[in-house]
Amino acid sequence: MDNPFENGMKACTSLYDKYYQNCVMKLPPGACIDSENYRKCLTNHIGSCDIDTCFEDVSIACRSIYPSNYAECATTHHNICGDLQG
């Protein structure tokens, strides 16, 4: 049987992936390829992301998928949005 909280986590994680990929695509081609820490390099270039939209989408996802524990879901995944800011 599906665990609604786990489903919420998956939905929120997929939101993170969506914004992360959008940011990666905005980088100049090959900008981070030679970096020792590829992910950190990408994170340093994350400023072009729409963080407000990330927060909004996470709120909607948590509210619809796991309303009985909205606060925990939103807090956990808003931290992911915050991580996108570098």
Swiss-Prot record:
Keywords attached to this entry: Allergen
Top-rank lineage group of the source organism: Eukaryota
Misc note: On the 2D-gel the determined pI of this protein is: 5.1, its MW is: 10 kDa.
Protein's name in the database: Allergen Hum j 3
